[in-house]
A protein has these predicted regions:
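Short intrinsically disordered terminal tails
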Residues: 1-4, 190-192
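Conserved recognition-core residues within compact binding domains
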Residues: 12-99, 103-192
Length: 192
């Protein structure tokens, strides 16, 4: 019995390594969705009915995320596809609660574009608002001082980085501070 358990562990480890190698080669890998007998999700962000082999058509929620309806015992439940992909294929040892789209494209649910994040990390990697004229989060022109103001929020605390005569210096200061604070979760448009 002990040998059988050891063999099962070895098979699982080999299977996991094989799946990881396929993912690195950008090969589509399918896995069953936990809690559902008839559905599988792929590393490319597709969902299929395993009984019929049919790829299911996803819809958008009001925020632009792709979602899918799955049925179990006649009961329908709606799931966000990015969560299905991430929870199925990516380990989450730190138990981070959010799934982040690295490139901010809510419809790109490829495994290479997803990662687990805390709520704070997820907030750092968001698109700029449309009224941002500096094109960098946390940099604005202060009319009274007639200078560019760089600031940042870390753990809910607003921090003044400084006032600068030109936009480029303010951007550089903000980007450097964001990289220090948030690392890989710094928004792509904030990188120098």
């Amino acid at each position: 019995m002990e040998n059988l358990l050891e063999m099962q562990k070895n098979v699982k480890a080999i299977t996991r390594k094989y799946e990881e190698d396929l993912i690195k080669l950008n090969v589509e890998v399918w896995k069953d969705i936990d809690g559902y007998d008839n559905y599988a999700v792929s590393t490319f962000g597709k969902v299929k009915n395993t009984k019929t082999g049919r790829i299911l058509k996803a819809g958008n929620d009001k925020y632009g995320y792709l979602q899918i309806n799955l049925y179990y015992d006649g009961v329908m439940k709606t799931h966000k596809i990015h969560r299905l992909v991430c929870c199925t294929f990516i380990d989450n040892p730190d138990n981070k609660e959010c799934v982040d789209h690295k490139n901010n494209d809510r419809t790109n649910n490829d495994i290479s574009n997803l990662r687990f994040a805390t709520a704070n990390e997820n907030q750092q990697n968001r698109k700029l608002s449309n009224n941002n004229t500096s094109k960098v989060k946390g940099v604005s022109f202060n009319k009274k001082a007639k200078k560019w103001h760089a600031h940042i929020q870390i753990d809910g605390i607003n921090i003044n980085i400084g006032y600068y005569d030109n936009l480029e210096d303010a951007k550089t200061a903000r980007v450097n501070r964001a990289n220090e604070a948030f690392g890989e979760y710094t928004n792509a448009c904030e990188k120098l």
